[in-house]
Amino acid sequence: MERLAPAKVNLGLSVRFRREDGYHELHTLFAPFSLADRLVVEPVSSGLHFQGPYGRENLAYRAASLYLEAAGQPGGVRILLEKRIPEGAGLGGGSSDAAQVLLALQALYPAEVDLFALARTLGADVPFFLLGRGAEARGVGERLKPLALPPVPAVVFFPGLRVPTPLVYRAVRPEDFGPDLPVEAILEALARGEEPPYWNSLEGPAFRLFPELKEVRGRMRALGLRGVLMSGSGSAFFGLAEGPDHARRAAEALRAWGRAWAGTLGGGDAGSGPA
């Protein structure tokens, strides 16, 4: 069984406040992006055989182990993971891989297992990737409301800098906190091809830690991309294009400074098809 594990971008991310448990309350819009890792998941008689980076420490391996245990060890599995989504980019690659493993194993070994409960133990972004579509998220990202997002041509750019998510959150200051995102206004702007009124509260701390990230927005805007924003805790940025050709030209130009992909964000189901 082959599955695609799509990347995500945050169409705005507002850090509302720091909670008593030490985590930050968030309000964000998740959108799948067409860049994807590739997974091959096959049943075997016994054991958990994983071929991919980090071995047993990989979130996809941990997801498989959790599911097989919860399902009563119905059989074994062999997993091949081909990484395309860069690490430390804020694109959710590891979380997406884990979600697709859970979905694949449920298809191979059906059982009364709460996938969302397992996903929450693996990471805050994993439940979103089970949905396979856009979503509004609150809490630390685990409280989800599905959203219908229009497909938008876009470019994702990774400058090659790995940014540890915990480091960015530790650098958040009270002045970085923001109000709820204007969800309806963002959706309307996307549908009309206009600049969405979103922001990312994590840009401030990320820019303080890594000042070189400030240059990225200017480079992308100079290529005619609109709504340029850092995704998650960085270091990847995305920008909205006028059309597929514009996206391809912009991505080609950006490859002089890092890795770039032209594709589509939002739209219909993501992650369910073959590679």
Swiss-Prot record:
Binding site for ATP: P86, E87, G88, A89, G90, L91, G92, G93, G94, S95, S96
GO molecular function, one term: 4-(cytidine 5'-diphospho)-2-C-methyl-D-erythritol kinase activity
EC number of this enzyme: 2.7.1.148
GO-annotated biological processes: isopentenyl diphosphate biosynthetic process, methylerythritol 4-phosphate pathway; terpenoid biosynthetic process
Catalytic center residues: K8, D125
Pathway: Isoprenoid biosynthesis; isopentenyl diphosphate biosynthesis via DXP pathway; isopentenyl diphosphate from 1-deoxy-D-xylulose 5-phosphate: step 3/6
Keyword line: ATP-binding, Isoprene biosynthesis, Kinase, Nucleotide-binding, Transferase
Keyword Repeat set for record: no
Domain of life from the UniProt record: Bacteria
UniProt-listed InterPro entries: GHMP_kinase_C_dom (IPR013750), GHMP_kinase_C_sf (IPR036554), GHMP_kinase_N_dom (IPR006204), IspE (IPR004424), Ribosomal_Su5_D2-typ_SF (IPR020568), Ribsml_uS5_D2-typ_fold_subgr (IPR014721)
Record flagged with keyword ATP-binding: yes
Reactions performed catalytically: 4-CDP-2-C-methyl-D-erythritol + ATP = 4-CDP-2-C-methyl-D-erythritol 2-phosphate + ADP + H(+)
HAMAP family assigned to the protein according to its UniProt record, in alphabetical order: IspE (MF_00061)
Entry's family note: Belongs to the GHMP kinase family. IspE subfamily.
Function per UniProt: Catalyzes the phosphorylation of the position 2 hydroxy group of 4-diphosphocytidyl-2C-methyl-D-erythritol.
Protein name: 4-diphosphocytidyl-2-C-methyl-D-erythritol kinase
The organism of origin for this protein: Thermus thermophilus (strain ATCC 27634 / DSM 579 / HB8)
Gene responsible for this protein: ispE
